[in-house]
Design a protein with these regions (language model features):
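Non-catalytic C-terminal accessory modules of carbohydrate-active enzymes
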Residues: 115-194
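Extended glycan-interaction surfaces of carbohydrate-active proteins
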Residues: 10-97, 121-135
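Short alpha-helical patches at coil-to-helix transitions and adjacent helical residues
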Residues: 57-61, 100-103, 150-154
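A structural signal for alpha-helical segments
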Residues: 13-19, 101, 142-148
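Well-ordered alpha-helical scaffold segments within catalytic/enzyme domains
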Residues: 1-14, 60-72, 105-114, 156-165
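Long, well-ordered mid-to-C-terminal structural blocks that present hydrophobic/aromatic surfaces
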Residues: 89, 93-119
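Carbohydrate-binding/catalytic loop surfaces
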Residues: 39-52, 105-107, 113-114, 140-152, ...
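Alpha-helical packing segments of well-folded alpha/beta enzyme cores
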Residues: 3-4, 24, 102, 122, ...
């Protein structure tokens, strides 16, 4: 809701809806940590986190923008790192596991947290196991046609190289030590900066 409120204010649209959205936002619960200090996947007490699940929607605030509620709270940042690492423990046992897009979600989160080796592991798994010889991407290793990583893979590389938001450009925020040299040009950042 914060994003739609901000976008509406910037664009001068939906002014009558902003108070409704602000009221809804005020009633929403804050992020929560589970008993292991990981950010909770589910808010309901009776629902336990499922670290084997292919999605990581509880880390949404780290995908394409960095939620200030997370980024300014050391406990939440640590909780997100723990959640990513817990899911990675399971994926490392299976060299990535299933569902490429779930790995993209974890990798985006790792980039936001500066976890370069975790992001690099996922980039490597995705590059080695989720493409057929004809360069068609797959949902699972080498099977089930799926286009998710066609956009996710290059986006992951970019997130490892640069992060931007209004008023901030961060170069090499998640560069793994394996990338010792190189260059890139023509990168389009938020705000039309190239």
């Amino acid at each position: 809701l914060r994003s739609v409120i901000e976008a509406s204010q910037v664009l001068g649209v939906n002014q009558d809806k902003i108070p409704v959205w602000e009221s809804m936002q005020a009633k929403m619960p804050s992020y929560m940590l589970n008993e292991n200090g990981e950010i909770r996947e589910w808010m309901w007490k009776d629902l336990q986190d499922n670290h084997k699940h292919r999605h990581a929607s509880h880390l949404f605030g780290l995908y394409d923008f960095h939620d200030p509620l997370i980024m300014k709270d050391k406990d939440l940042l640590e909780g997100c790192k723990r959640a990513v690492n817990r899911r990675m423990e399971i994926r490392r046992q299976d060299n990535g596991g299933i569902m490429a897009f779930g790995m993209i979600q974890l990798a985006f989160s790792a980039c936001a947290l500066g976890e370069s080796e975790t992001a690099y592991d996922m980039l490597t798994w995705l590059g080695n196991s989720y493409w057929n010889n004809n360069m068609v991407s797959t949902h699972d290793p080498k099977k089930t046609f799926n286009l998710d990583i066609c956009g996710g893979y290059p986006s992951l590389v970019m997130k490892m190289l640069v992060y931007s938001e209004p008023g901030l450009i961060s170069l090499l925020p998640c560069k793994p030590q394996q990338w010792r040299s190189g260059h890139i040009n023509g990168v389009a950042l938020r705000g039309g900066i190239i």
